[in-house]
């Protein structure tokens, strides 16, 4: 399958959504690494079109199964009016509405949430961090609790190819990201990261969104939330969502020079984990058993390393800092602590 072009897109939309009144304006959106994404203007509403080529969109040399959009379509449909998780979705927090999915073209059409803003781009004095964090945490907690050990979800969300790619890019090479003077630290990072990456290629205990980072969380001034980018959805491990969000809150907080911004991200995280625990209820001790708590720091640490020194550095928080900068040194040190010392992450993030 060749990559879809803009000229091919409009006829496909007309076929899939015959009642859509397009205005002829199509804009390819930036910021995504995995897929090709367009905003298509319409009357009265625009829509988002997403195409998955058989490789990472920004890196054609890295093959990636375009089945990922099938998983996203399946995940979005869970929150539709007749979906199994429809009670979790409301106007305060939900994914975009799925409009159409064409597996042959690997093309997904969905609601445009352009009136909302990415979490890492909001004006912090207008978006309340406490309400936002708590609302997001409660949603993810309910999502994990409701799907916990559900055989139907386990069978329909075996997104193994994505786990293999993540292992290849994040866990397997983690010890090569950064400059390690201590051979024993490097060896421990190598072993613990590799072991986790291999274990995550199996099915886990609950549904996970799989890409819970600030650019996937869109908010407005009332703290209403829209969660986008569900192509990594998988019956996986809670740490893949909670640890992922923890890592990104930590990174955003670390690099922001403003005390107010640092406090904003800190309160966002604390409210998130409190909301998560409250929503998970009695299931929290099952979702985060001793093994999960022992391993969550590995995911947090490897996510910091791949963003500070690896292939996902460009365009994110560490991009402005040159090699040798104290910010990168501090990030590397913290990542090593989280990976090698399980209690470091447990205490730092309140698991």
List each model region and its residues.
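ATP-binding pocket architecture of kinase catalytic cores
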Residues: 39-152
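Juxta-kinase regulatory segment immediately upstream of eukaryotic protein kinase catalytic domains
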Residues: 1-27
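Short, glycine/acidic-enriched loop or turn micro-motifs at the edges of active sites
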Residues: 53, 114, 214, 232, ...
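Active-site activation/catalytic loop segments of kinase-like enzymes and analogous catalytic loops
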Residues: 74, 239-282, 300-319
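Active-site catalytic-loop/activation-segment of kinase and kinase-like phosphoryl-transfer enzymes
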Residues: 1-6, 108, 142-148, 152-198, ...
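Active-site acidic catalytic loop and adjacent metal/ATP-binding pocket
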Residues: 27-42, 47-49, 194-240
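ATP/Mg2+ or Mg2+-diphosphate-binding catalytic cores
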Residues: 287, 298-351
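A glycine-centered beta->alpha junction motif in the catalytic cores
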Residues: 51-58, 110-126, 145, 174, ...
């Amino acid at each position: 399958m060749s990559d879809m072009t803009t000229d091919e897109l409009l006829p496909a939309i007309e076929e899939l959504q015959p009642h859509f009144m397009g205005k002829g304006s199509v804009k390819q959106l930036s910021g995504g690494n995995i897929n090709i994404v367009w905003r298509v203007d319409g009357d009265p509403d625009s829509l988002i079109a997403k195409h998955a080529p058989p490789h990472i969109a920004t890196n054609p040399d890295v093959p990636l199964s375009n089945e990922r959009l099938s998983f996203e379509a399946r995940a979005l449909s869970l929150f539709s009016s007749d979906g199994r998780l429809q009670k979790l979705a409301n106007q305060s927090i939900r994914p975009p509405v799925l409009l159409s999915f064409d597996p042959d073209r690997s093309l997904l059409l969905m609601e445009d949430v352009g009136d909302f803003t990415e979490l890492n781009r909001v004006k912090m004095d207008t978006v309340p961090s406490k309400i936002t964090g708590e609302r997001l945490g409660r949603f993810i907690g309910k999502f994990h609790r409701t799907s916990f050990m559900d055989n139907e979800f386990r069978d329909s969300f075996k997104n193994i190819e994505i786990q293999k790619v993540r292992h290849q890019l994040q866990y397997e090479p983690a010890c090569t990201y950064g400059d390690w003077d201590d051979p024993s630290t490097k060896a421990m990072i190598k072993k613990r990261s590799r072991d986790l990456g291999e274990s995550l290629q199996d099915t886990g205990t609950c549904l996970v969104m799989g890409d819970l980072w600030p650019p996937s969380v869109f908010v407005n001034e009332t703290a209403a939330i829209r969660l986008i980018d569900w192509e990594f959805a998988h019956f996986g491990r809670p740490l893949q969502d909670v640890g992922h969000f923890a890592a990104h809150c930590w990174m955003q907080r670390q690099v922001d020079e403003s005390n107010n911004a640092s406090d904003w991200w800190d309160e966002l995280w604390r409210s998130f984990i409190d909301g998560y625990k409250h929503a998970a209820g009695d299931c929290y001790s099952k979702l985060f058993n001793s093994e999960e708590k022992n391993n969550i720091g590995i995911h947090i640490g490897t996510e910091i390393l791949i963003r500070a020194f690896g292939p996902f550095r460009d365009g994110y928080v560490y991009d402005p800092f040159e090699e040798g900068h104290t910010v990168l040194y501090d990030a590397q040190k913290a990542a090593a602590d989280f990976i090698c010392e399980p209690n470091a992450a447990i205490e730092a993030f309140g698991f």
